[in-house]
Amino acid sequence: GFNIFEAISNCSDILTHFGGHPLAAGMGLNVKDIAAFRKRINDFAKNNYPVMPIQTLKIDCKLSPYYLTLDLVNNLAELEPFGTDNAQPVFGLYNLTLTNVAAIGDGKHLKIEAAKKGKSVRMVKFRTTLDEFPHKIGDTLDFAVKLSKSTFKNKDYISAQIVDFRKSGIDIDKYYREKNDYLLFKLGKKNKTELYPNRDICAVVYKYLKSQKGYKYTFDDLYFELANYLTYGQLAFALDAFEEAGLIKREGNITLNDVKTKANLERTDTLTVLKGRL
């Protein structure tokens, strides 16, 4: 991954103090040195990480819901105590159909139920609200979970805590490849994937936004919904052109503006400049 301590150490001569390790660091600097620090640390990243390392989640075992039993959880207890040098196992549950989602803990967390071939699994996702959950009942999802045992009224239950989730069938290699190419292009470097959103692609994106009456989830969530029709960069530039043309507004969420006339997207500065660079 990106070594934040190494990056900050590279700027040590303009810092009043600093410390940390590869995953976290703290520092102090004078106000007059903020601009210099910003340039130095960004130059370090560009020179040492032309493509930023991909954040990965290790799945220790792919698991069918039918093998999600108390016996399994009890056997996992033999591996304790878990910690930095002995990570708690993460299990992958793939191609489950979402059957129920409910807010718990004053709306700060989610209780999620999903099923596969008649076997239902109950899970909890902490620090995620209903407004942040982009999926609907009937969607097919993959889950990465940690398992433990909880006891209520003298009865033991399986506790499945969701570490991460995603839509099933996602081509994650395509996502990272296209995202990296887009970011490198923004830095002035050549790209290997299509970036220009032609009329048909713009139509796909705009029709989807209209069908959803805007979009309240993340850019990546929107990309995964449309990934079969476009590239990461094409979506990014299409949204930029929409906003410039007054079709949408982006303030966290995407909202559709009430537009009475057709917009000529090809005449936007966004697409004119893009076409000139390609």
Regions found by a protein language model. Name each.
Residues 1-278:
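Acidic, two-metal ion nucleic-acid-processing modules in DNA metabolism proteins
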